[in-house]
Amino acid sequence: MTKQARRRLIPFLVIIAASSVVLVTFFSRKDNTTQDLPEQTTTVATRDVVTPAPIVSTTNTSTPAEATPSTTEDSTGNSTKDSVQDSTDASALPAPFDVLQVMQHALKDTPLTLGSLENLEKWKLEAHFTQTGAGIQSIRFADIFETVDGKLAWNNFRSDGGEQPSIEEMYLLVDEQTVNEKIVPALGAYKIVINDQELNLSSASDWQVSSIRSDGIHFIATIIDEHKTEIAKVHRTWTLDNQFGLQLSQSIHNLTSQDVVVQWVQYGPPSLTVDRSRYMDRRRFRFGWELGLDGHLAPIQSNDVVLEFADAIKERSDTIWPTVDSIEENDKLSWFASSNRYFAIATFPNITKEGEGTRLFGDKVEKITTVVDGPEGSETVLTGLYSPETTVSGGGIYDISMGIYAGPLERSVLDTEQPYMALNLRDLVLYQMSSMCAICTFQWLADFLAIVLTLLDRYVVFDWGFSIIILVLIVRTILHPITKRSQINMQRFGKVMQKLKPEIDKLKKKYPNDPKRVQGEQMVLMKQYGVNPLQMLGCLPMFLQMPVWIALYALLYFMFDIRQESAFFGVFQMIGDWPFLADLSSADHFFGTFENPVQFLFWNITGINILPILMGGIFFVQQKYMSPQSMATSPEQESQQKIMRIMMVVMFPLMLYSAPSGLTLYILTSSTVGILESRRIRKHIDSVPIEPNVAQPDEIGRKPKDKQGRAWADAMEARRKKVQNKAKKRSFKKRD
């Protein structure tokens, strides 16, 4: 072969070889991904490296004790990694495997259940698991019910026997979802990425049920190459304590002698069911994190980031953690939860019963995403938990275990038991309305009212209804001095306005086309008689009670302790199972309940209620006693005031028609006490003559002694100077 021919042949052979490598690489990749969760797009600069555990079994599938991952532990009992090193150098990355796949297994018909609905002394719930994704099929509580009727039926059955009520009456916390004709269990596995090869683990045949015991259910998924050689195993073991806690012990075992880079992706807590009445949809996604304080232990924060369900469904897919602010502040994730009005599912790192262990979740969950499915009005939000890319050394184990809380938002549990205390999960209990009312709801005030109501119920009157009435008396007593002063000021103001009415009429006739002049002269007259509108504090007691009403609204709406609790020792339920005030957290249902809620405007009406109607009548009567003297200076203003009074009588009851009956009971009682208080103050005023205080000529220029009077005088003086300055500007003329 000539030299010239070799120069032509060698490049041709190199091109053929390179093309062959590209084609083999392209056609040998197997796509196992699905589109249920948004793909991770963030890159990770460094990867954790997990070195081999002391003992690693590559074929262990017999019992949970043998198959459960064995990791090294520190003094606190938490699994640790032997070493972590920087592996940013591309040449140091593990070599790619051939085509990987998931070993398939036969389906089992055996029930996969932990807990019980019958043994109340031992279990609080019953959890069903599924081979699909080795996740949770459903969780149902044993002693928490959907409705008051269901609660009464089951309590009667358990005490007196008879026909067993339906299991459907017990509260269903979570159920598997069907998305695009595919079953999605809660907290089920989604996929694993090994050396950039994505392997779907969401099918039932991907998992082998290794063992079923009363204290745990163990699943195994095996990753093999094209030669059927086992490359890795994924272990998932579910256990249940005797309260509302579950433990998910899961790990990835590298069965080879070389390093592999893995990333774990699973489903997180989904959106929970909405309340039956749907008065307000308060489903939320919550986060707890430690502040980035250079490794120092910091309080776990949570209330600054609350993702409402209504905001989550605006985007069909989104990344909800980390946020822009959390990246800037270097916040470290500690827990993630999905909640509705009364319940929550939270995931968090492993912490012992003594509250010891790391509170950081970042080595297991680096990113959280959402996907929205379902038609408008019936959306479901699925969440995805992405682990960081981690290098697992040959024979090593990557532990991705986590704890789970699946229970009520009850502070007696979250504020007194571990590991919830260490993680500050008590902040899941948030007595706060959303949207515009969020800034009006003072969390500290709602917490204080919760303490007062709880003390009254447990140690004083032993009934939530009477506790609310006593709370009314406490608040009205505190506000009585202000109420009395406002009533006296209202009476004095009314008498002065009656005496000044002829003078004001003269001013209107004198300046018919200059209302500002009339208003200014009227202010001068009021100043001469020692009164001003700021002294008329007739609405101040109501405004001071508004924060209490809003805080109490949020408290009674979200407080689990009041859920399905009756008022006045259940006396109304003794009359033929009358549902009136059977549940202070829902409407009063004076005329019974509807089997299916009826849609009306923004609410689902669950029954016909009487307390809001009585509240409207009380408001009307209250205006007769506490309305201040009208300051209308024109027919238009007078008609506007009438409209406002009518709206208060009509709109308040309409807005609160489906509100918790505990709140309407509070407002109704407070308004009734206010009328009686007003009558007593009026009798006191009538017995003491109150005459207008006419200012002396030498006192007209002096400022009043009271704060309101001084503020009024300063405002009038500033207004007078402003008018004078404008008059001077208008009188200036430019000469030619």
Where are the model-predicted features located?
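Membrane-interface starts of transmembrane alpha-helices
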Residues: 460-471, 607-611, 637-644
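Core hydrophobic alpha-helical membrane-spanning segments
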Residues: 11-25, 552, 613-617, 650-651
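Membrane-interface amphipathic helices and adjacent TM-edge segments
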Residues: 250, 395, 477-552, 619-657, ...
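Membrane-protein biogenesis/insertion across secretory and organellar systems
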Residues: 1-473, 477, 688-736
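Hydrophobic core segments of alpha-helical transmembrane domains in multi-pass membrane proteins
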Residues: 612, 616, 662-671
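Conserved catalytic motifs of ABC-family nucleotide-binding domains
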Residues: 554-618
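Transmembrane helix interruption/hinge and helix-loop junction motifs
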Residues: 461-463, 654-664
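Juxtamembrane "helix exit" motif at the C-terminal ends of alpha-helical transmembrane segments
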Residues: 22-27, 453-458, 547-567, 621-627
